[in-house]
Amino acid sequence: MENIDEWLVQAKKVTYEASREPGLGRIQQRLSREPSQMVLTARHDILRAVCCAALASLVAFTAIDRIAVGLYQKQQPTWVAAPSAASPFGLLIGK
């Protein structure tokens, strides 16, 4: 530790140069350009709402699709005793 005085002088120069007014001005400018905490929170809330809406629409679409497929694929007999309404046999065979 022979050069402790020299080290302290160098440390003082570095500290003084780092705390000069133009450096602080640049830091303040940069901080002023950054969004505030309220803006960051609002962005986070909007992102969460969009993700929730997308997930809800996906779940709703899947549920509606399953219900529609279940209704569409009901088992119906295809023999002549139970003709479809569009069939001409429906006119010949009464209910």
From Swiss-Prot:
Is this entry keyworded Ribosomal protein? no
Keyword list (alphabetical) reads: Cadmium, Cadmium resistance, Cobalt, Nickel, Plasmid
Single biological process term from Gene Ontology: response to cadmium ion
Q: Does the keyword Cell membrane apply?
A: no
A Pfam family that this protein carries is CnrY
Report the domain of life of the source organism: Bacteria
Q: Which InterPro entries match?
A: CnrY
Question: Which family is this sequence assigned to?
Answer: To A.eutrophus CnrY.
Annotated function = Component of the NCC cation-efflux system that confers resistance to nickel, cobalt and cadmium. May be involved in the regulation of NCC.
Q: Which NCBIfam families does the record match to this protein?
A: CnrY_NccY_antiS
Indicate what this protein is called per its UniProt record: Nickel-cobalt-cadmium resistance protein NccY
